[in-house]
């Protein structure tokens, strides 16, 4: 098992776009710097929040390079290299290693709905093509397939560089089973901001976060409070942050968080089709939540 330290607060970084919807690599560097200076221990580049399905391979590689150049060595840079195509994921994973990423995150294959054996073979085959540590990513609400705890247990046992999972099934029972059966040094991250504190109580490490774009320092404070034994403070911070945790999902992610970043003057641009811009009402909702929490 790898001793890699991904950190506790990892931001699933948005991908900035120019007005013509080309990738704004300069702004990606600026955003990565901002996030690291405001509570992020690491960054996932080209994950769900980074609109990976609408980025091509070359764009993803250039994003990996840009973020590594800006914050490599200061924060963990994790490349989102998973897809529904094992062969393509292998190619992208090798490129991520070449440009200096610290790890890769592999989302469960979406759309083609493999069996648990297919999931096992998919993840194992990709992981064996690289020396980088691998984080699995289970998000059945988007992929249509649930990576079951028994499958994760097999992978943890059989593939040394599969060292972590981002668990976003939204099921505390599943998290409990994962923590019960997995080795103690296998890292579990919450994939839902609103479940970070409950999952910490089950022995999970931290969060791969959307809200850390806006409230990274506050999320770090919540985790600090919990790990130091001040569970009352941690619970109070969780309750305080809960409106932003939920507010950033009033429509499809990353539409609200991009609106929030633009409100803060971070100029990340819009979203690529088939996603569409936040409505005026949605922007106002996000703005009000941010104002109430003094995040603007």
UniProtKB/Swiss-Prot annotation:
Keyword Lyase attached: yes
Keywords tagged on the record: Amino-acid biosynthesis, Cytoplasm, Diaminopimelate biosynthesis, Lyase, Lysine biosynthesis, Schiff base
Positions bound to pyruvate: 49, 208
EC number: 4.3.3.7
GO cellular component terms attached to this protein's record: cytosol
InterPro entries: Aldolase_TIM, DapA, DapA-like, Schiff_base-form_aldolases_AS, Schiff_base-form_aldolases_CS
SUPFAM superfamilies with a match to the protein in the record: Aldolase
One GO MF term attached to the UniProt entry: 4-hydroxy-tetrahydrodipicolinate synthase activity
Pathway(s) per entry: Amino-acid biosynthesis; L-lysine biosynthesis via DAP pathway; (S)-tetrahydrodipicolinate from L-aspartate: step 3/4
SMART domains documented for this protein: DHDPS
Swiss-Prot/TrEMBL catalytic activity: L-aspartate 4-semialdehyde + pyruvate = (2S,4S)-4-hydroxy-2,3,4,5-tetrahydrodipicolinate + H2O + H(+)
Single Gene Ontology BP annotation: diaminopimelate biosynthetic process
Residue positions of the active site: 137 (proton donor/acceptor), 166 (schiff-base intermediate with substrate)
Predominant location category: cytoplasm
Site label Part of a proton relay during catalysis, positions: 48, 111
Listed PROSITE patterns: DHDPS_1, DHDPS_2
Localization (cell): Cytoplasm
Quaternary structure and interacting proteins, as annotated: Homotetramer; dimer of dimers.
Chain's role: Catalyzes the condensation of (S)-aspartate-beta-semialdehyde [(S)-ASA] and pyruvate to 4-hydroxy-tetrahydrodipicolinate (HTPA).
HAMAP family from the UniProt entry: DapA
Family stated for the protein in its record: Belongs to the DapA family.
Protein name per UniProt: 4-hydroxy-tetrahydrodipicolinate synthase
UniProt gene name: dapA
